[in-house]
Every structure is written in structure tokens, then in C-alpha cells.
Amino acid sequence: MPRGIVVKYRSVLLQPRNIYMSLAELLRNTVTESLSKLYQQPFSDKDFQVNQTKPEFEGDYTIVLFSLIKKLKKSPEAAGNELGTHLTTVYPHLFSRYNIIKGFLNLSVAESYWVELLQKNYTDGNYGKQPAKGERVMVEYSSPNTNKPLHLGHLRNNFLGWSAAAILKANGYDIVKTCIANDRGIHICKSMVAWQLFANGATPESTGMKGDHFVGDYYVLFGTELKKQVEVLIAGGIEKEAAEKQAPIMLQAQQMLVDWEAGKPEVIELWKKMNSWVYAGFDVTYKRIGSDFDKTYYESDTYLLGKDLVEFGLKKGVFFQKEDGSVWIDLTADGLDEKIVRRKDGTAVYMTQDIGLAVKKYEEYQCNKSIYVVGNEQDYHFKVLKLICRKLDLPAADGIFHLSYGMVELPSGRMKTREGTVVDADDMIDEMVNVSKQKTEELGKVKDFTSDELKELYDTIGLGALKFFLLRVDPKKKMLFNPEESIDFQGFTGPFIQFIHARIKSILRKETAAPAAHFTTPLLPLEKELIVTMEQYPVIIEQAATDYNPSHIANYVYAVAKTFSSFYSEHKVASAESEEKKQLRLRLCQMTANIIASGMGLLGIKVPERM
């Protein structure tokens, strides 16, 4: 029995399935039915345990007999022989032989099952995907601030959100992709003040800069100027904390925020203009990385939402008011703490806004689930959000789910913004494309491409390397991004998988499988291993959707590519030892290429036809 990736997904193989009945589920159903017929009493799949057979024993799946023998009052040997004989006799197309070792019934799957699986699915480009479930899921991701360009952390967020949405869609869910633009607040005003002070009327057009980078430079400039002014105040005997509040440029930003909230025309005009520059820049980046949204919410439109819910919560007794007029909720009985929902001056806090927006989104889309793709520094916030919504008996409450993820770091350390040392998304993508160009040219296989084809190829490989590296890691884990490692054509990388796909396509351009074929020659070990690995694809998609975890897809597709690489290094296709073997292997090639293209597609990664 093939090992490695199969064992990794053992627990999922034995879960309830979808329209693609996995071998594991088929086995459980068959064994349950057989036990009931053999012993004339009811059985369920909870009466026995199924595992994959350990490498040192013969077989594919193992039935643990100990729980059965108590019910049957038979020895393991007797029960195993009766069940094994029944299965191999009544279902010869499914089980070819069995053996019993110390209370374990090891079953070997009939080779005809694997061949039939290949024959049935090798041309199906949608293999593993499910029909509509009639349930809607919202995935909110990206959520940028409109005072700076996207950075490396945003890339992980975008890739994770887009991929999670694609995986859920493949499982039959109706998907709504949304984004919340954080387009108001003191951080936005800082860029606006700096532009007023230092830009001299400069624009992205006049400087030849991308709009989000242009505005981001003024946010950095604000931080630089603030630091200078604070140092002057400290030198004059003012404490640092007071100096940071009293610095003239900070006071200007605070006044800018007051003027914005008051609707001062010239401030609103500047705010709209600078935001439009940023959105134009975002659009270029989003198009480049493939991110898209069905609806964008703007904080400037939603920040007042939820205020009526505070009054509702007070009347309901969920919230309480302190002497200073501020409104809170006491969550200490739930293992949390007290949380403010309205300041003493009557203004809303972020939590209040999020409660209001959750209600708005539910009213607009009636989603069964609302997934927030946000970094793990907000874990507590979303625990509180869901809990408050539940205590308010809001219909949106049960569907709230925080898809938390860890920070992305580089060897140089954690990313920062105020100091201007952030790793911009555009710069990172450019670097990856340049590295892909260098690596591809080193292979010496680019002479048959036009310049336009090469540009597209370098973009595809570079962006594919970046996406795969960021998605191959469990979202919950903090990760270290290594550009050089991510583009290794021989490693656990996107380019390796892309190369395998291109190699298969090269084979299929020269030869295609004949429509009709009959196979009698036994499968060789690597042929069987490849089919066994591909059989799991529907289960892996389902697992990735259940866990909201694209790394399951990334790990699986790599396993498929690696298994094919081992197979191809040992066995010829076009010049196979017989026509029967040639037809079988062409089918293996076609199904492998389809699964790689499908799986990488769920990660948002293109696979070239040629490399």
C-alpha cells in the first residue's frame, strides 16, 4: 500500500463523504452490510474501526476486530476468517484477499477497483468538486488601510481568503467575497496632513508613482516628522508620552479627523482624492495577484452602524452603563473580561461597528457562515464579537467564524510600517518574478518562447512560487518566508509542481489516450500508488473546506506531483513495453494533469502548458 500522503489524511478518509464515495466509505458500508447479513443482527460503522494497513503488513485497509468479537462472542481468528471470506467472495471486484494478524483483519483492494477508478475519472476536469448545497458563505478578506500599499502580510491574507473561498465553492457552497476598506480614522489623516505639508501639489501622475505607494510615502513621512518634533519637545523637558500628544503635526492630524467627522468640504475633498489614488493602486495589485470581491464595504459608510444595538442591548440587560456614561458588557462569567461598546462621549468603538456590520451583511446576503480572514492578533476581538452577537440573539451570531492566521516574517525580522521598512507586496512580487526569470534561464530551456510568452511564464512561476509558499503552511502558524527556497524547482514548491504539469502536457501533446481500452496486465507499484493518491482528491477538497485550510490542498497536490515524478522516472509512457501499458499510463498522465491544474487552481495558481 502506498504510504506518506495517504497516512497523513487517514482520519479524514473515514469521515462521511459526498457524491464521490471514497474507498474508505465504501469499505465501511460494505463491512457494515456484510456483518448484518452474516450474523443476522444490526451493526453500524461504530461497531468497528478501520485504519490503513501498516507498512510492514500485507493489505490496504485493516479492520480492528476487538470490538466486534465482544459482540459476536467469537475469537479474532474465527470472526476475521468469516468476515474476510464473505468480503472476498461476495465482493471480488472490491477485495482480492485477506490475512489476519493478532485481531486485525487486513484487506487487499482488488486491482480492478483502481483501474475502474482511473477509467471513470481520467478525463473529468471537475473530479472532486461537488454540486450546489444550497448554502451561502461569505468570506471577508484583504481589509486594507487606505494610507499605504499592501504588504507581505496582506499577501498571505489575500491568498488565504481567495483560496478558502475557491475551496468552499468547489464543495458546493454559494460564495460571496467581500472586503472592508479601512478608509477613515487618524491613520488616514496622518497621510493627508503630511501631503498638505510636504507635497507641494505632487500627485501620482506628476511623480510617475503608483497611487498607494505615493500616499504610503506620506504616511511614512508623517512618522519621520513626528519623531523629530517629539525629540525637540523632549529636549525642552516634556515627557515622551505628552510630547507625542502635543507635537504640532499630531495636533494637526487630530484636528483633521475632527474636521472630517464634521464634514468640512475641503477635508472631505482631499480625503476622497487621496483615497482614489490608493484604490487605483490597490486595483493594479489585486488584478496582478488575482484577488476579487463581490462587495466592498467602506468603514466611512459603516462606522456609525451598531449604535442602535447599544440601546437595544441596554434595554435587554446585556449591556450596562457606568457612572461616566460609557456602556460596557461584562463577559467575566464567560472567561473573558469587561468590554466597552460605547465611549462616555457617545462615540462608537470598533466592536460596535463590527456588530452593526455583521447585522448589515446578514440582512443583505442571509449567509449561513460569515468568515473573517484576519490575523491572530485579533483572536480575542472575534471571540468577543461572536459572544456579544449571541447574547443579543442576533441571527448573524452563529455564522461568525474567525479564520485566524499567523504573521509572515522575513529573515530580517518582523515587518514595520511607520519606519518605512515594510515589505511592499508589489516589491515582493517583482522580486519573485525576477528570481523566477533567473532560475528559469539557468535551466536553459527558454529559447523556444517569444518575449511575451517568457514574460507571462516568469510572472506565472514567480507568483505561483509566492502563493504556494504562503499557502502550504497551516494558516494558524507563524511563518518565515524565504524567497530563494520558494522558487526551488526541485523542492516543496509551486514551481516544482508547475514543472511536473508542463512535463505531463508535453507528453500529452504527442500522445493521447485511446477512447476504448481493456486492461489485464497487473498494475506496477508506482502505477497503483499514483491512482491511490489521486483517489483521495475529493476527500482532500472536503477536508480543506471543513478546516478552512488551503495547506491541505497544497500538501496534497505536491504529493501527487512527487508521486508522478517517481513514476515517470521509472516508467516510459510513449515507448511503454506494450500498447496496453501505454494506454494505461496516458490515462495516468491525463488524470494527474487534471488534478494538478484543479488543485493549483484552488490555490489561485496558474499552471503553464510549457516550461
Give the positions of each predicted feature.
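Secondary-structure boundary elements
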Residues: Y113-G128
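Non-catalytic interaction-recognition regions
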Residues: Y20-V115, P131-M611
